């Protein structure tokens, strides 16, 4: 009974969002999966109808993801590195490549390719984010080639150019700068070369747009109309 009461507020909150002008519920939840599953099971009979978006680095166990089969509608997954050397050095994840790829395979098995409604709003499917990093650290060619070969050329891919070095990254010669136009162009050419059919690519220069300024009274990010490309 104590467990049920602990999750009741989450279920009620989800239902309130479902009745408001909201298109989905997104969360980075890996360490709260059992609680999330219970909250959703309680919320659905109360009227929850929104797609649930699982926002993840992809450093998840397949066993954990299987607990979410039929619960999560959209997986928003990172594919950060193609080399465990960089996963170990920069993310303290020595087995990032194997673990993230196994996780993405399981996510795709559950939800498949991205499905949108008549207004273009995502309702179900997998979206893979790939952040372009300086000096080839992200292993973009290997990562994207793996996606096309092992997942699907139709999987939705979000190629991001917004990397901006802060804090300790500024002290690393490999990470201390934003990506160059040449690095951006090299990855953009991979879209056609590898036959990636669906997705988006940020414009060059997005790193400044997505750098939060918490001293702004109107919020940490500029309004959409203020962003200059």
Where are these regions (language model features)?
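A cross-family glycoside hydrolase active-site/sugar-binding cleft signature
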Residues: 25-29, 51-57, 78, 127-131, ...
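Alpha-helix-loop-beta-strand connector modules within alpha/beta enzyme cores
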Residues: 39-51, 99-110, 181-190
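Anionic-ligand binding region
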Residues: 88-119
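Short glycine-enriched, charge-decorated loop/helix-capping segments at active-site entrances
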Residues: 2, 89-94, 171-178
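Conserved Radical SAM active-site core
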Residues: 1-70, 74, 84-85
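Auxiliary Fe-S-binding modules of radical SAM enzymes
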Residues: 112-229
């Amino acid at each position: 009974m104590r467990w049920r009461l602990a999750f009741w507020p989450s279920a009620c909150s989800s239902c309130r969002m479902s009745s408001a002008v909201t298109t989905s519920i997104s969360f980075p939840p890996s360490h709260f999966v059992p609680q999330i599953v219970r909250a959703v099971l309680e919320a659905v009979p109360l009227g929850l109808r929104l797609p649930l978006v699982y926002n993840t680095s992809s450093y998840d166990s397949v066993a954990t993801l299987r607990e979410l089969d039929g619960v999560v509608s959209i997986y928003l997954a990172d594919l950060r590195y193609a080399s465990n050397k960089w996963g170990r050095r920069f993310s303290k994840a020595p087995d990032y490549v194997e673990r993230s790829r196994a996780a993405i395979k399981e996510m795709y098995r559950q939800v498949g390719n991205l499905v949108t409604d008549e207004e273009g709003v995502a309702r179900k499917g997998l979206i893979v984010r790939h952040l372009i990093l300086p000096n080839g650290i992200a292993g973009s060619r290997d990562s994207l080639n793996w996606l096309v070969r092992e997942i699907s050329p139709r999987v939705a891919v979000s190629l991001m150019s917004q990397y901006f070095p802060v804090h300790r990254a500024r002290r690393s010669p490999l990470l201390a700068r934003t990506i160059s136009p040449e690095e951006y162009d090299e990855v953009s050419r991979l879209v056609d070369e590898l036959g990636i059919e669906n997705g988006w690519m940020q414009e060059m220069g997005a790193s400044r747009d997505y750098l939060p300024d918490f001293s702004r009274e109107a919020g940490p990010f500029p309004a959409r109309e203020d962003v200059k490309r």
